[in-house]
Amino acid sequence: DVERSRGLGDVYKRQDVDVTKGIIHHEEGLDLMPCNIDLSGVDVSLVNAMSREFVLKTYVESMREFYDYILIDCMPSLGMITVNSLTASDRVLVPVQAAYLPVKGLEQLITTIYRVKKHLNPQIQFEGILISMLNARTNYAKDIMELIKKYYGESIPIFESKIPFSVKAAETSAAGVSIFTLDKKHPVAQAYEKLTKEVIAHE
């Protein structure tokens, strides 16, 4: 069993955290480091911390030897957790829902990424922009895709893969399984498989 007190909150709040604690070994071949309620207070706890932008990077560097890939999933926020995640990363994949407000917020995120690249992590590169929750049958979604290509297509790669909107895919969280376990032939599963191949091809 995973120690419930362990998680990303511990990584941010304790310099002496045991890097092997709090990791869940999932039957589908992935290791997960979940967050807990402690993560909600991280921005406040890091206000006076030394090298506060590099806390997660220090942890990630200690884990690199054990993994081929380490994926950091960020909440839609521009706070210290996101800055830490960008500082710790080699590449950044930017998912954006095919809707007006998420695309409008994309500008702020990309500005933050460029600032991190300039001041904290010169090595970080854009993996690309991934359009998600797409209903390709609507003119609205097509207009959103054209908008993304117009403003970002020349400077940031845009994945050919698109993740379609699906209620069934959303149900995977409640079921506690991936879309591949639920239905590996589902369009969302096929889209993620295509995306994975596209990402690997970029290496």
Feature-to-residue mapping (PLM):
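Single conserved hydrophobic/aromatic residue that forms the stacking wall/gate
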Residues: 1-12
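Cytosolic-facing regulatory segments adjacent to core modules
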Residues: 17-22, 26-72, 76-78
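Hydrophobic side chains within well-formed alpha-helices
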Residues: 19, 52, 56, 144, ...
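Conserved catalytic-core segment of NTP-binding enzymes
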Residues: 64-164
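Short, glycine-rich, amphipathic interfacial segments at transmembrane boundaries or analogous
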Residues: 164-171
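C-terminal boundary of histidine-terminating zinc-finger modules
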Residues: 173-188
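C-terminal alpha-helix
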Residues: 194-203
